[in-house]
Curated annotation (Swiss-Prot):
Belongs to the MraZ family. It comes from Shewanella piezotolerans (strain WP3 / JCM 13877). Keywords: Cytoplasm, DNA-binding, Repeat, Transcription, Transcription regulation. This is Transcriptional regulator MraZ. InterPro entries: MraZ, MraZ_C, MraZ_dom, MraZ_N, MraZ_sf, SpoVT-AbrB_dom, SpoVT-AbrB_sf. Transmembrane segments: none annotated. One of its GO terms (biological process) is negative regulation of DNA-templated transcription initiation. It is found in: Cytoplasm, Nucleoid. Residues 5-52, 81-124 form the SpoVT-AbrB domain. CDD domains: MraZ_C, MraZ_N. Forms oligomers. The keyword Kinase does not apply. The gene is mraZ. One of its GO terms (molecular function) is DNA-binding transcription factor activity. Its main location: cytoplasm.
Length: 152
């Protein structure tokens, strides 16, 4: 399970170094293999351990090629999907189309989301956090069945 937000940098070749605390679990449980794709609702990338991605792929295979919305989701997620493996230094190369989609240039945030990571441009992440904070403050959490009993 992945959690926490880490500030990271892209090098001149478009590589990121996975934070050390995530390298060993990725190596031990996922053979250092990831699939990177786009988030269809936010300007960020999603990094899935390959086994997690296989579950997503099964769900995608059940979507219709004749329904425009379903086909669009498949096209985005599968079209951008890129398999990669951490190198000996714990780095992964982000292909140019993926970097462009998320506007990744130099400074980024890698955010653990239990079964996957999100990779954000640092400024976009800060903006998203502020928007989320405001949305939570303005939301009637008791009206949301799934959040009504949620407590920390």
């Amino acid at each position: 399970m992945f959690s926490g937000a880490s500030a990271i940098n892209l090098d001149a070749k478009g590589r990121i170094a996975m934070p050390k605390r995530h390298r060993e679990p990725l190596h031990a449980h996922h053979n250092s293999q990831l699939v990177i794709t786009v988030d269809i609702q936010s300007p960020c990338l999603l990094l899935y351990p390959v086994q997690e991605w296989q579950q997503i792929a099964v769900k995608l295979s059940q979507l219709s090629d004749t329904q425009p919305a379903e086909r669009a989701i498949k096209r985005m997620l599968l079209g951008y999907a890129h398999e990669c493996e951490l190198d000996g230094n714990g780095r992964i190369l982000l292909p140019t189309p993926l970097r462009q989609y998320a506007n990744l240039e130099k400074r980024a945030m890698l955010v653990g989301q239990l079964n996957k990571f999100e990779l954000w441009d640092e400024a976009a992440w800060q903006q998203q956090i502020e928007e989320s904070r405001i949305a939570i403050l303005n939301e009637d959490l008791a009206a949301n069945q799934r959040l009504a009993d949620f407590s920390l």
